[in-house]
A protein has these predicted regions:
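Short, glycine/acidic-enriched loop or turn micro-motifs at the edges of active sites
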Residues: 23-25, 51, 172, 202
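Active-site-adjacent "gating/activation" loops or surface patches in catalytic cores
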Residues: 191-202
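Active-site neighborhoods of enzymes that stabilize oxyanions during catalysis
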Residues: 2-5, 11, 119-193
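Aromatic- and Gly/Pro-rich amphipathic surface segment
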Residues: 38-41, 45-76
Length: 202
């Protein structure tokens, strides 16, 4: 993953596409979209992680299909050749999920970055924020899937026996060990057999 610093973004703010992908766990009662409307980095576009995930399934935040992704990004005014900086204002680093989506759907990895420290660091450094609406000109974004980047349940089940690859769980150690309930209703506690816990907050 490519990180860029706040000073770099400030200097290059007019030459990159900026995405706010703030998302919060339901129990926080916070809305990334409402917070974006209140203040965001100038020229940034909001990426709604809930709205831009697959809706025909009862699991949250599953990837949409290739055509739908192209439509979503076209409406955001992003071209295939654009350099992109993604940030968030959340405790779950949702910008990294948005980054993965772009990589999975074929955007050049050298052109997709995450802002180190996110909006919190940007504001702490007294850099400019706004509530102005960003003008968007629709594009014709072309996407393709790098399906090797995602494993399905059958592949993970087989891997428990065959050990073809390592499985890393980025949740907290308490959730990994099943000592606390999952924050989303209907999900069992615990972890995949033989997986490793490396919490994203480290």
């Amino acid at each position: 993953m490519s990180l860029v610093e706040t000073d770099w973004l400030e200097k290059n703010i007019s030459s990159v596409k900026i995405i706010d992908c703030s998302w919060h766990m339901p129990q926080t009662k916070r809305s990334g979209l409402e917070e974006y409307k209140n203040q965001h980095i100038p020229n940034s576009i909001f990426f709604d992680l809930d709205a831009n995930s697959k809706k025909e399934i009862n699991l949250p935040h599953m990837l949409v299909d290739q055509n739908e992704w192209g439509q979503i990004i076209s409406k955001m005014g992003i071209d295939n050749e654009d350099e992109i900086v993604i940030y968030d204002n959340s405790d779950v680093i949702s910008s990294c999920r948005c980054w993965f989506n772009f990589i999975y759907f074929g955007h050049n990895p050298k052109l997709v970055h995450v802002l180190n420290g996110g909006l919190k660091k940007w504001i702490k450094e007294n850099k400019e924020v706004t509530n102005d609406v960003t003008n968007i000109k629709t594009t014709d974004y072309k996407s393709f899937e790098k399906k090797e980047l995602v494993k399905n349940k059958e592949q993970v089940d087989l891997n428990i026996e065959e050990q073809y690859f390592k499985v890393i769980d980025a949740r907290s150690k308490e959730r990994f060990d099943g000592k606390v309930p999952e924050p989303r209703k209907g999900l069992r506690s615990g972890s995949i057999k033989d997986s490793f816990c490396i919490p994203f907050g480290l």
